[in-house]
Amino acid sequence: MSSPEGSSVTFRRAPATLRRPAIERFARRLQKEVADGAPFDTLITGDAELRRLNRDFRKKDYATDVLSFPSGGPGLGDLAISLGRARAQAREFGHTIEQEISILMLHGVLHLLGHDHEVDRGRMASLEKRWRAKLGLPTGLIERVQS
């Protein structure tokens, strides 16, 4: 559950080569700039855990790249990111795993803020594109699906 003080990132089964401090700094930047200071927590874990969470909470029995869980409390909510999916997508799109995790984190935070690209007629796609440009991130999730 989101802590009231600040956003946190928990790493499970992450390789030693993963630049954890950069990911943690990016989470704090998202909290400040995108979420208007509202904290959120991020779990970076494996495909098996994302599949279990997706099955338990969304009734979809497959691993996905990012899940968002709004809190309804003082914090924004929680994100779960699949390290395996992030690694594969980073390779596929030609950028670093840290960049891919940042893209997934931004996408998840926009969902925590109440945006839903499946029903909002492009509003979340526009927001994601604007924030990616401001934050210096490569092509995002919604653009990949739309192209």
Swiss-Prot record:
One of its GO terms (cellular component) is cytoplasm. It is found in: Cytoplasm. The keyword rRNA processing applies. Its cofactor is Zn(2+). Its EC number is 3.1.-.-. It comes from the Bacteria. Keywords: Cytoplasm, Endonuclease, Hydrolase, Metal-binding, Nuclease, Ribosome biogenesis, rRNA processing, Zinc. It is an enzyme of class 3 (hydrolase). GO terms for molecular function: metalloendopeptidase activity; RNA endonuclease activity; zinc ion binding. Binds 1 zinc ion. Its main location: cytoplasm. Zn(2+) binds at residues 107, 111, 117. Pfam families: YbeY. GO terms for biological process: rRNA processing. The keyword Hydrolase applies. NCBIfam families: rRNA maturation RNase YbeY (TIGR00043). Single strand-specific metallo-endoribonuclease involved in late-stage 70S ribosome quality control and in maturation of the 3' terminus of the 16S rRNA. Belongs to the endoribonuclease YbeY family. This is Endoribonuclease YbeY. It comes from Solibacter usitatus (strain Ellin6076).
